[in-house]
Design a protein with these regions (language model features):
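Pyridoxal 5′-phosphate
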Residues: 1-380
């Protein structure tokens, strides 16, 4: 049975060009980049080129890119690295209630060590209230961390305005852009972002590779002790093959970003229009005005999303009831709870996220089966 994959916010399939470019560094180009001989120097050059490509995608200097193992490590490094480096200046951090668990749990860890965290509410669309954000700032605030785009409902936050508020008070601004990088254009210079997290497997690179952008001049404590790698900020022999893969994925994303963004939007709108016409009693979660181009999050009245997902899986359709990091949890999504969605709707939420390998034929197959399954479940 053919798999129809609609969970590209959870992970993406590695692009053929990306896979091809990384393979030599798992076989013939296996040198340690810290070594002086030729295959070591070759590995070091490959890392430098990948760093340049990642930097180019978000418009920063290559020296401002630090490679990590994933978006979660980048988030942990940003929050804890800034908190510990600035603990003499203050102990207060501001974030939102709809952040990824990597942010929320990092904040909980910091709370256990004496830091104070303010969790800002969002409105029914998942948008942050800027006035409320600014009102929470104190003379002890050292960091504001707000996600660029939400992983469940796709809401794109007013990142540029948040950065302006942070800087007007002399505060560092970090954004978790794991869902945004590669899906929409991002310019850290124009948006005045201080720190940004990204992850390879969300943009057609392998799992196990990520990056953290840190604006030049910002000091942060290292997350891992050991050797000299990543300018003494992230020890451990570099994962050359996956760093190369991330660089290639970023190069492809930069070249095709406008076309790719439009493709996702067209597929999303085509799918949503068909669902709205054929299935009654559905509710769109999040705003359609400021939303990731490939994201649909809808709730079906009187349905359980776990059963719905299992029924879809039986016909080869992969989707999600929320983020992949929380979809197995019995409790309602913290994001849907934060936007005030009633429990009878949050338990029937379905997330569909589109990618480069999706087609209109996939959408037709999805809608045909979704209509049938929802009808059968409601009659049961």
């Amino acid at each position: 049975m053919e798999v129809r994959y609609f969970d590209n916010s959870a992970t993406t399939r590695i692009k053929d060009e990306v896979f091809k470019e990384m393979i030599p560094y798992l076989s013939i180009e296996y040198g340690n980049p810290s070594s002086l001989y030729s295959i070591g120097r070759s590995a070091k050059r490959a890392i430098s080129e990948a760093r340049r490509r990642v930097a180019s995608l978000i418009n920063c200097s290559p020296e401002e890119i630090y490679f990590t193992s994933c978006g979660s490590e980048s988030d942990n490094t940003a929050l804890k690295g800034i908190a510990y480096a600035n603990k003499e200046k203050g102990n207060h951090i501001i974030t939102s209630k709809i952040e990824h668990p990597a942010i929320l749990n990092s904040c909980k860890s910091l709370e256990n060590k004496g830091f104070k965290i303010s969790y800002i509410d969002v409105d029914k669309d998942g948008m942050l209230n800027l006035e409320k954000l600014e009102s929470e700032i104190t003379d002890q605030t050292i960091l504001i961390s707000i996600m660029y785009a939400n992983n469940e409902i796709g809401t794109i936050e007013p990142v540029k305005e948040i950065a302006q508020i942070a800087h007007s008070h002399g505060i560092i601004f970090h954004t978790d852009a794991v869902q945004a990088v590669g899906n929409i254009p991002i310019d850290v210079r124009k948006m005045n972002i201080d720190m940004l997290s990204l992850s390879g497997h969300k943009l057609y690179a392998p799992k196990g590779i990520g990056a953290l952008y840190v604006k030049s001049g910002i000091e942060f404590e290292r997350f891992m002790d050991g050797g000299h790698q990543e300018k003494n900020k992230r020890s451990g022999t570099e994962n050359v093959a996956e760093i190369v893969a991330l660089g290639k994925a970023c190069q492809i994303a930069e070249k095709n970003i406008e076309q790719y963004q439009q493709k996702l939007k067209n597929l999303r709108d085509y799918c949503l229009n068909k669902i709205q016409k054929k299935i009654p009693d559905i509710y769109i979660n999040g705003t359609m005005e400021r939303r990731l181009p490939g994201n649909i999050n809808i709730s079906f009245k009187d349905l359980n999303s776990v059963e719905l997902l299992l029924r879809l899986d039986e016909v080869g359709i992969c989707a999600s009831g929320g983020s992949a990091c929380s979809s197995k949890e019995a409790s309602p999504s913290h994001v849907l709870t934060a936007i005030g969605l009633p429990s009878e709707l949050s338990k029937g939420a379905l997330r569909l996220t589109f990618g480069d390998y999706n087609t209109k034929e996939d959408v037709e197959y999805l809608v045909e089966n979704l209509v049938r399954i929802v009808e059968e479940m409601r009659k049961a």
